[in-house]
Structure formats: C-alpha cells, structure tokens
From Swiss-Prot:
GO terms for cellular component: plasma membrane; proton-transporting ATP synthase complex. This is ATP synthase subunit delta. The keyword Cell membrane applies. F-type ATPases have 2 components, F(1) - the catalytic core - and F(0) - the membrane proton channel. F(1) has five subunits: alpha(3), beta(3), gamma(1), delta(1), epsilon(1). F(0) has three main subunits: a(1), b(2) and c(10-14). The alpha and beta chains form an alternating ring which encloses part of the gamma chain. F(1) is attached to F(0) by a central stalk formed by the gamma and epsilon chains, while a peripheral stalk is formed by the delta and b chains. Gene3D superfamilies: N-terminal domain of the delta subunit of the F1F0-ATP synthase. It is found in: Cell membrane. It holds the Pfam family OSCP. GO terms for molecular function: proton-transporting ATP synthase activity, rotational mechanism. Signal peptide: none annotated.
C-alpha cells in the first residue's frame, strides 16, 4: 500500500546522494541505521511510544547519529520521524537499493540450493541470467535444506523452480488426480 510512498522517499534521497557523489556511502549508512533500529529494543520503544513527542524523538536521533551519518541522511531520518514513517525505513532502503540496481543496469537474482554452488556453476548461472535479462547479475545465494535438491531462482517477478521438493509435490498432485 505504501510502496509508492517508499519509492518517492527513496528516489528523493537517491537523487541527493547522486548530486553529492555519495550513493554508496548513503546506502551503507542507511543499512547501518536500519540494523541499529532493528536490533535495539530501546530505540523501537522510543519510536513507538505515544507519550514521547516528535521533537524529543528527533533530538534522540540527532544525538545518536549526528557524527555517524552524513547530515543529509540525518535530515532524511528527521523528516521520516516528523511524518511518522521512521519505522518503515527498511522499506525505503530496499527501494533505494532497487533504484541503484536499475540505474546501474543490474538485477538481483535470489538463488536457493541445498549446498553452495561451485564456482563454475555460479559463473555459468550468472552468464545465462545475464544473457536472458541483458543486465549485470547480482547473486544472492541462500542454503535451504527444505528444497531437497535442485535450484530455485527468482529474478524480479520471474521464478525458475527446478527443486526436487516442487517436483515431488507435482507428482503427488498428479497421482491424487488419477484416483
């Protein structure tokens, strides 16, 4: 529902980052802030607490991050606090990462296997996906024992499911239909 809004915030910050030649720095800093918020119960409690006013929340964030992140990022965080959107910072980060990939002709491919891919398999997969999508492929690999065997690939909205677990489910469905 708020994806459009998340994208607008992300695009605004991305444009500022581009103007200042600090895209990588901004992405890195935002990831760090997201991790700090996610891993700190105290910060989450402060942000969610209805009796702590917006001004106080902004003061706390300024104290926490003024020497750790660029001033433009701090201003961005303060705007999110003002608009009561700071708890959704991770969504803005994800959108900013998507924008980065788009602008650099890259695409993320999520891969699930039971065991890690060999170097040759990884290179072949990157090459084939690169040819198919005509973009540089960024692999995000995950080990998932539940797939039993094979490989699961997700690129954007496209899914290539060559897992043994899916094939077994399909066979089971076919057998049940025949009965």
């Amino acid at each position: 529902m708020y994806e459009y809004l998340d994208r607008r915030y992300a695009l605004a910050l991305y444009e500022v980052a581009e103007e200042n030649n600090k895209v990588d720095e901004y992405l890195r800093d935002l990831k760090e802030v997201v991790n700090i918020i996610k891993n700190s119960e105290d910060i989450c409690k402060i942000l969610k607490h209805p009796e702590i006013n917006t001004s106080r929340k902004k003061e706390i964030f300024t104290e926490l991050f003024k020497d750790k992140v660029d001033n433009k990022i701090l201003s961005f965080l303060l705007v999110l606090i003002e608009k009561d959107r700071i708890l959704y910072l991770e969504e803005k980060l994800k959108e900013m990462e998507k924008i980065y990939l788009e602008k650099n002709n890259m695409i993320l491919a999520n891969i699930k296997t039971v065991i890690p891919l060999l170097k040759e398999e990884r290179e072949e997969l990157i090459e084939k996906l690169g040819n198919k999508y005509n973009k540089k492929i960024i692999l995000e690999e995950e080990i998932d024992k539940s797939i039993i065997g094979g490989v699961y690939v997700r690129v954007g909205d496209d899914v290539l499911d060559g897992t043994l677990s899916t094939r077994l489910k399909d066979i089971k469905k076919m057998m049940l239909k025949r009965e």
